[in-house]
């Protein structure tokens, strides 16, 4: 692991500070989107080698992590924490996707695609784009008022996903945002008991169960229903509703809201693979828990300390997208509106037509 620091000042060159770093933690989550890194730097004023680096890392500075010469992470320092007079200073960093999570915008899109929306909002925020997966799904109208840039992108892709049937995920590749199809399998790597698994646990929960979805039209009248009869019989009703959208198959969209028993696995291992990150799939063979097959990574934490690379993964049986539902904005005329319009007409007043 190589760690480089760039001071937030025009013309500053990267400085290799690896010799002063005692540990590195790098991780991510499907739900939180931005990947993070925490580096612990020795605070030893009497050490000549460390003193010569003249470390004065501050908020907004850039930290780069490399493994075997390949860029693993590029992020900005958000906060620092010092422990002890001659202990360590820890720096918390976020990749540039954090700008999309913390910035909001107002947009009115018509007859465009999720990929074009992504290019537009990134350009407005000064974020470069890399590989943006094409959906080729035309979105008739999407209005955003104060949504985060990340939510704008994911709401567009969530809407497109209802027609493509695919799942999407945002990631930063250095300074460029990419939108990829979620669930890519880690190649040529297996987590296996007795080889690279040091601990594994397995749990089941029905906390997020949905076993019946009622479909409604724009007049709030029920137009259909999808359900899981077996789960209803066993666990009782956990109901959700879905309102029809133009250009979207209502039955398919409603079925995507059904959710059964969630099974979560936590695995800790050594000699980890750098492709074992949130959003990817990984194979597991573990006799103790009975786990055998392909699972999807929801959260990952990789740690480098004393020359050893360990990783902790939270896995799921299902490949789940970080869906952001878009609520259609429709002008609704109330009974009072209609009566007022009728009164104006009877009085001979001019009535505006929408």
What are the functions of these language-model segments?
Residues 21, 25-30, 34, 104, ...:
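Solvent-exposed, flexible loop/coil residues
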Residues 80-85, 299-307:
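Short, conserved beta-turn/loop elements at beta-strand boundaries and strand-helix junctions
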Residues 110, 123-125, 312-315, 328-331:
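A general structural signal for short secondary-structure boundary/capping elements
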């Amino acid at each position: 692991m190589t760690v480089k620091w760039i001071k937030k000042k025009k013309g500053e060159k990267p400085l290799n500070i690896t010799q002063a770093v005692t540990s590195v933690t790098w991780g991510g989550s499907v739900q939180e989107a931005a990947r993070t890194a925490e580096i612990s730097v020795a605070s030893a004023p009497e050490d000549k080698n460390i003193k010569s680096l003249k470390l004065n890392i501050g908020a907004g500075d850039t930290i780069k992590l490399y493994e075997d010469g390949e860029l693993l992470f590029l992020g900005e320092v958000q906060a620092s924490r010092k422990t002890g007079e001659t202990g360590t200073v820890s720096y918390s960093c976020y990749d540039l996707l954090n700008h999309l999570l913390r910035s909001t915008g107002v947009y009115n899109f018509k007859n465009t695609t999720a990929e074009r929306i992504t290019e537009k909002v990134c350009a407005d925020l000064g974020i470069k784009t890399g590989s943006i997966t094409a959906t080729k799904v035309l979105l008739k109208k999407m209005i955003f008022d104060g949504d985060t840039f990340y939510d704008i992108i994911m709401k567009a892709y969530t809407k497109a996903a209802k027609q493509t049937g695919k799942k999407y995920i945002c990631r930063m590749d250095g300074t460029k945002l990419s939108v990829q199809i979620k669930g890519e399998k880690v190649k040529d790597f297996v987590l296996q008991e007795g080889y690279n698994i040091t601990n594994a646990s397995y749990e089941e929960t029905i906390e997020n169960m949905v076993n019946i979805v009622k479909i409604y039209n724009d007049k709030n009248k029920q137009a259909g229903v999808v359900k899981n009869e077996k789960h209803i019989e066993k666990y009782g009703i956990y109901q959700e509703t879905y309102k029809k959208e133009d250009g979207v198959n209502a039955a398919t969209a409603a079925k995507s809201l059904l959710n059964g028993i969630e099974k979560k696995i936590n695995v800790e291992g050594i000699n980890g693979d750098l492709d074992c990150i949130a959003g990817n799939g990984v194979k597991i063979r573990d006799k103790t828990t009975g786990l055998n097959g392909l699972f999807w990574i929801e959260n990952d934490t990789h740690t480098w300390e004393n020359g050893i690379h360990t990783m902790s993964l939270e896995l799921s049986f299902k490949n789940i997208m970080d869906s952001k539902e878009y609520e259609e904005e429709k002008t609704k005329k109330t009974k009072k509106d209609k009566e007022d319009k009728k009164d104006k007409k009877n009085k001979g007043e001019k009535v505006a037509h929408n």
